[in-house]
Amino acid sequence: MGQPGRPEFPDRAARRPGGPADVGSLVVDDSPALCAALDAGLGASLCLVADNAGAELLADLALVDHLLATGRSERVALHVKPYPYFVSDALASDVAECLAVLGEGPRGRLLRAAAEGRWTLRTHDYYRAPGWYRDAPGDLVAEWAAASLTVFKGDLNYRRLVGDAHWPALTPFADVVGYFPGPVAALRTLKCEVVVGLAPGTLAALDASGEDWRVSGVHGLLQVAGL
């Protein structure tokens, strides 16, 4: 049984079709550390950097509602793009559309949280600019630094976070994002060659599988640093 108020998840070792037999859907799974940090209050002031609109953004809003309703977060800032990199990128207008189709309960709670200043919607021109987050302007860095935890979602945000370089896959995630001004988490589906923080056994199994695992969209990861 899980803790009260915490949603139950399927077996984290569940396999995905097309993946190597001894590697699960997540090639890195730091969710136990992330959940423990949230339970310990690290998400009190959380910055969530969104990725896609549509169903994914609805899930993001459900997460924000859950974090606020359970007290795992006192304040959540949802960061979206001012203009899309890709047609699917979440914008402020998408948040409004998602709120309109949410059930009365979560919609009402989120609107009250917004009125009380516990949930804010933020954007910044740098989210649509070419460049790495290491080189982000000072006012955006200050927003990340003010958060007790920043969560980046999506493949593009991951590439910008780690610098989109040809890192050896065994390079520790914490080393690559050591510049970041506070605790950070990254969630993404692998759709490009860039990946860090793999365990040696995981990398060996993936490379031996013959699968084009870095870009196939079959695998994902959840990584944390600075918790």
Where are these regions (language model features)?
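Residues at the starts of beta-strands that form the adenosine-phosphate
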Residues: 45, 73-77, 183
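Short amphipathic alpha-helices and their capping/turn segments at secondary-structure boundaries
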Residues: 34, 66-69, 138-145
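C-terminal functional extensions of proteins
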Residues: 80-82, 89-227
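Electropositive, gly/pro-rich neighborhoods at or near active sites that engage anionic ligands
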Residues: 1-47, 53-59
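N-terminal beta1-alpha1-beta2 submodule of the flavodoxin-like/Rossmannoid cofactor-binding fold
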Residues: 68, 81-84
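Gly/Ser/Thr-rich loops at beta-strand to alpha-helix junctions
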Residues: 49-58, 83-85, 155-160
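Histidine-anchored nucleotide/phosphate-binding helix
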Residues: 55-77
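Conserved structured core elements
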Residues: 28, 57-61, 134, 138-141
